Amino acid sequence: MIKAVCPGSFDPVTLGHLDIIERAARTFDEVVVAVLTNPRKEPLFTVEERLEMLREATKHIPNVSVAAADGLLVDFARQQGCRVIVKGLRPIQDFEYEWQMGAVNRQLDGNIETCFLMSRIEYAHLSSSIVRELAYFGRPTEGLVPPFTARRLREKFAKTQP
């Protein structure tokens, strides 16, 4: 049995994230979606809110679980019994950083592999940052994020609209 971790900040989860998670779930026996915190960023949603959105978005995938992760990803992967880290790659912008992180993780634990899944062309332009900006200005996010997440974005930004 091969268990994988699919990490991210998921602030918020997008359809691009969900596509990578679904493809990982078809490839590996079990997938843990890890919600990471980045101390250099101020998130829009709390960890609990992001966990809730991910649980809702992945409830149709039986071999996927969702968990919060602090510290180094490779340590979390080891603690969870994951042998693979799954990362989605968008054209150009993600490769260098993700390759460096994969190399560092391999150096920290040679038993954990990094697997890159290329984003589908329809999601190559998509990022949580773009979704947050659209939502902030009151633009629809349907078709970019799961329906539950779109509702949460509308609720979050309803207070900021004139």
UniProtKB/Swiss-Prot annotation:
EC no. given is: 2.7.7.3
- Which residues make up the binding site for substrate? S9, K41, L73, K87
**Family the entry assigns:** Belongs to the bacterial CoaD family.
Task: Decide whether keyword Nucleotide-binding is in the record.
Answer: yes
* Cofactors named for this entry: Mg(2+)
Family matches, as InterPro entries: Cyt_trans-like, PPAT, Rossmann-like_a/b/a_fold
Pathways involved: Cofactor biosynthesis; coenzyme A biosynthesis; CoA from (R)-pantothenate: step 4/5
The record's function comment reads: Reversibly transfers an adenylyl group from ATP to 4'-phosphopantetheine, yielding dephospho-CoA (dPCoA) and pyrophosphate.
Q: What is its main location?
A: cytoplasm
- Report the protein name in the record: Phosphopantetheine adenylyltransferase
Work out whether the entry's keyword set contains Cytoplasm. yes
**A single Gene Ontology CC term:** cytoplasm
> Hey, where's the site called Transition state stabilizer on this chain?
H17
Show the SUPFAM superfamilies listed in the entry: Nucleotidylyl transferase
Q: What is the lineage of its organism?
A: Bacteria, Bacillati, Bacillota, Clostridia, Eubacteriales
Q: Which GO terms describe its molecular function?
A: ATP binding; pantetheine-phosphate adenylyltransferase activity
Domain of life according to the entry: Bacteria
Catalytic activity annotation = (R)-4'-phosphopantetheine + ATP + H(+) = 3'-dephospho-CoA + diphosphate
Check the record and name the Pfam families matching this protein: CTP_transf_like
Per the UniProt record, the source organism is Symbiobacterium thermophilum (strain DSM 24528 / JCM 14929 / IAM 14863 / T)
UniProt gene name:
coaD
- The entry's ATP-binding residues are S9, F10, H17, G88, L89, R90, E98, Y123, A124, H125, L126, S127, S128, S129
The coiled-coil regions, if any, are none
Keyword terms of this UniProt record: ATP-binding, Coenzyme A biosynthesis, Cytoplasm, Magnesium, Nucleotide-binding, Nucleotidyltransferase, Transferase
HAMAP family per the UniProt record, alphabetical? PPAT_bact
Give the multimer and partner information.
Answer: Homohexamer.
Tell me the compartments it is located in.
Cytoplasm
According to its UniProt entry, the protein's GO biological process terms are: coenzyme A biosynthetic process
